[in-house]
């Protein structure tokens, strides 16, 4: 049952990738000739490094402030806000490092294969801060959709750009705030970005159904494919 569930989740992720290519094409070739912009030009909050606290500041109870760490997100999404580590923060630290909905966080120092790992913040349940080996920024939602941009940032197209900017040291590499602002991103019309984000939201709902299908009836991935993936894209 678990193997079948994982297989369905993998197929749903593949549907997102296929839909992205169908709507926007290969980002390197940009066959639809969408404009390219510097990531910094579509930000409303510039990249900011996160909070460093010694291990002694971390607490085992539920009374501290949750902190997002690198192991807390995967493939553009926070894995589980309920399982974040907690620590003691001052009011000033909370105000300065507080995450808000639709922020994007990106790994700034790590082994080279994980450098640039990122996630969109969605579904915050309480005040949450972010740690020092990542940066946080916020996008102009009148120009771009954060779900679309996060998908772009998770692509090989961006990872190759990060590799050219990375400062390499023994066992790790780093990027700085200027490097992130200088990344080139393909920016289609906002209406198309929003269509893609709506599709991702539908897939995410289906992932929840897959998770609950073990105790109930199996999730019908073929029906989902016919009802959503085969829906025509609205031209702009």
Where on the chain are the PLM-derived regions?
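Sequence-specific dsDNA recognition surfaces
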Residues: 40-58, 71-104
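A short glycine-rich beta-alpha junction/loop motif
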Residues: 126-135, 144, 167-194
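Carboxylate-rich, polar loop motifs that coordinate divalent cations or form catalytic acidic clusters
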Residues: 65
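Periplasmic-binding protein-like
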Residues: 158-163
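Non-catalytic DNA-recognition/assembly elements of restriction-modification systems
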Residues: 4-51, 182, 186-236
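A short beta-sheet element
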Residues: 69, 94-154
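Short, solvent-exposed loop/turn positions at domain surfaces
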Residues: 3, 92-93, 169
């Amino acid at each position: 049952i678990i193997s079948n569930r994982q297989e369905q989740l993998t197929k749903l992720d593949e549907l997102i990738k296929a839909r992205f290519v169908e709507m926007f094409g290969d980002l390197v070739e940009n066959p639809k000739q969408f404009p390219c912009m510097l990531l910094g030009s579509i930000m409303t909050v510039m990249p900011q490094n996160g909070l460093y606290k010694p291990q002694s500041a971390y607490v085992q109870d539920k009374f501290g402030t949750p902190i997002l760490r690198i192991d807390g997100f995967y493939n553009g999404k926070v894995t589980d806000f309920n399982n974040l580590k907690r620590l003691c923060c001052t009011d000033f630290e909370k105000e300065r490092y507080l995450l808000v909905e639709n922020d994007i966080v990106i790994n700034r120092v790590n082994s080279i294969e994980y450098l640039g790992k990122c996630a969109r913040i969605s579904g915050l349940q309480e005040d949450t801060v972010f740690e020092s080996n990542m940066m946080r920024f916020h996008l102009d939602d009148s120009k771009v959709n954060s779900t679309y941009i996060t998908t772009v940032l998770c692509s090989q197209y961006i990872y190759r750009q990060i590799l050219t900017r990375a400062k390499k040291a023994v066992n790790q590499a780093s990027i700085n705030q200027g490097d992130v602002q200088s990344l080139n991103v393909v920016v289609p019309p906002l209406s198309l970005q929003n269509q893609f984000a709506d599709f991702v939201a539908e897939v995410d709902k289906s992932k929840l159904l897959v998770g609950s299908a073990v105790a109930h009836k199996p999730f019908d991935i073929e029906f989902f494919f016919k009802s959503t993936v085969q829906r025509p894209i609205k031209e702009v």
